[in-house]
């Protein structure tokens, strides 16, 4: 296992690009807001996009009966993963970062660890 380094940094451009891509789904024209209400076509499109990024990271993906998506990076040891996250659905006039940053920051951490060859002790979700 690689060790943590003070040189370990997230890719802010990749994170910003993902935030922008997700914010386009349900974007409210003329504003920086978006409307991606739960259980709408926009919500499904947003979840599908996030799932595609999880697949690119080879995460183990589960979707429950109401559409909650969890992607897990395996750790060195079995047991419950350390979880981070939020939501990607919005209220009718939600902001582009509302919930999205909490989900995408977790993916960025996983991608950064993978790129550095670091496998965590516990899984990350």
Model-assigned labels for residue ranges:
Residues 2-40:
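N-terminal capping segment at the start of a domain
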Residues 3, 20-27, 55-59, 112-119:
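Generic secondary-structure signature for well-ordered alpha-helical cores
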Residues 11-18, 42, 46-50, 109, ...:
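General structural feature for long, well-ordered alpha-helical segments within catalytic domains
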Residues 17-30, 46, 73, 78-82:
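N-terminal glycine-rich anion-binding loops that anchor highly charged ligand groups
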Residues 28-73:
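A non-catalytic alpha/beta surface segment that caps or lines the substrate-entry region
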Residues 38-41, 91-101:
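Short coil/turn segments at secondary-structure boundaries
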Residues 57, 65, 69-97, 106:
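Catalytic-core environment of secreted peptidases
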Residues 84, 96-125:
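Alpha-helical metal-binding/catalytic segments enriched in His/Glu/Asp
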């Amino acid at each position: 296992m690689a060790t943590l380094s003070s040189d370990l940094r997230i890719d802010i451009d990749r994170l910003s690009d993902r935030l922008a891509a997700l914010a386009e789904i349900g974007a409210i024209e003329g504003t920086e807001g978006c409307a991606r209400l739960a259980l709408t076509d926009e919500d499904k499109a947003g979840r599908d996009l996030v799932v595609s990024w999880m697949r690119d990271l080879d995460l183990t993906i589960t979707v429950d009966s109401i559409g909650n998506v969890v992607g897990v990076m395996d750790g060195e040891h079995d047991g419950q993963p350390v979880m981070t996250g939020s939501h990607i659905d919005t209220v009718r006039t939600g902001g582009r970062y509302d919930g999205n940053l909490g989900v995408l920051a977790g993916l960025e951490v996983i991608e950064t660890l993978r790129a550095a060859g670091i496998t965590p002790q516990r899984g990350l979700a």
